[in-house]
Swiss-Prot record:
UniProt key word tRNA processing: no
Purpose: Catalyzes the hydrolysis of the adenine ring of phosphoribosyl-AMP.
Catalytic EC class: hydrolase
Protein name: Phosphoribosyl-AMP cyclohydrolase
EC number(s) per entry: 3.5.4.19
Cofactor: how and how many bound: Binds 1 Mg(2+) ion per subunit. Binds 1 zinc ion per subunit.
Cofactor(s) the record lists: Mg(2+); Zn(2+)
NCBIfam families: PRK00051.1
Pathway involvement of the protein, from the record: Amino-acid biosynthesis; L-histidine biosynthesis; L-histidine from 5-phospho-alpha-D-ribose 1-diphosphate: step 3/9
Residues annotated to bind Zn(2+): 90, 106, 113
Binding residue positions for Mg(2+): 89, 91, 93
Length: 136
């Protein structure tokens, strides 16, 4: 059960803030994923205020590293991200933000930012036979 007793709309819940491991600029990576298909759409960055806004408004807010300002996805493009859930990874240095994406997530107009860059060459790994079917 989630404790929702903290209700201060001007700062991030200190219990959440204490769990974050920010980079030297005070940012945490946020992986944005379509909530129903699990498609990875993009990666953005959040500071405490961007995370607070994301958790309390139902819309995703990022901190723009290039423009040094907050931006809410979809305000200019109409390609809104409606928050469905937010999880913190085990190390506290990354967020998974599940969204209902309207239109393209990428500034290039593609649904996912990972379509434009494309796959990189890789040596594909294969699971040993003894690890097949969930063994080991």
């Amino acid at each position: 059960m989630t404790d929702t007793t903290y209700d201060n709309s001007t700062e991030l819940d200190p219990r959440i803030a204490a769990r974050l491991k920010r980079d030297v600029k005070g940012l945490v990576a946020a992986v944005i994923q379509q909530y129903d298909t699990h498609e990875v759409l993009m990666v953005g960055y959040m500071n405490d205020e961007a995370l607070r806004r994301t958790l309390t408004t139902g819309r995703v807010t990022f901190w723009s590293r290039s423009r040094q300002e907050y931006w809410r996805k979809g305000d200019t493009s109409g390609h809104v991200q409606y928050v469905k859930g937010v999880s913190l990874d085990c190390d506290g240095d990354a967020l998974l933000v599940e969204v209902d994406q309207v239109g393209a997530a990428c500034h290039t107009g593609k649904r996912s930012c990972f379509l434009e860059g494309g796959p990189l060459p890789v040596v594909e790994g294969h699971r040993p036979a003894e690890q097949q079917n969930g063994l080991s």
